[in-house]
Amino acid sequence: MAGAIWTDRPEMSKEPVYTLDVKYAGKSREDKIQDVRDAMKEAGANVHIISSMDDIVWLLNIRGNDIIYNPVVMSYVMVTMEQVHFYVQEEAVSEQVRAELEKAGVVLHDYFAIYEDVKALADDSKIMLEDACTNYTLYKNLPENVEVIFQSNPAAIMKGCKMKQRWKTFELPISKMQRQCADLSTGLKIM
């Protein structure tokens, strides 16, 4: 792990996690989770580990402030056919947010617990991973006998398909100054 080399590493962020209302998200977290499970079934997987923070916040309809100028939460998610395991700095999750997530079948765990939890996966597990987004330590902690299915994260693909409700969030008023700046920088007229 990086801590073995990076000895003066700053503490992990504990910025609050907040939920995103379905009117902005376009779809409930329950529906998104079911869509991911459907994609898992199609791929022949029964476990899906997500490491990409932007996909995690999209899937769970949450946001955070752990990385400057990026509304993500330092976290991992492990989706099974029964539960969703959310690995996060638990101090950053209020009781209200925890209750909302638990209602959707999401179980919270300490951020670092994922490394031990993947070691405990059953030998007959079929784990879907996106190799470009999975860290080496997490991958090396997988039991030897599990089947790994390297595939693009279905949440990333689903996230790219904007729903009608999401388009409404892009229809924000543009000020005269913003139009002028855009006109100057692009040479295009914005109406």
Feature annotation, model-predicted:
Residues 1-191:
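Active-site neighborhoods and metal-handling regions in enzymes and metal-associated proteins
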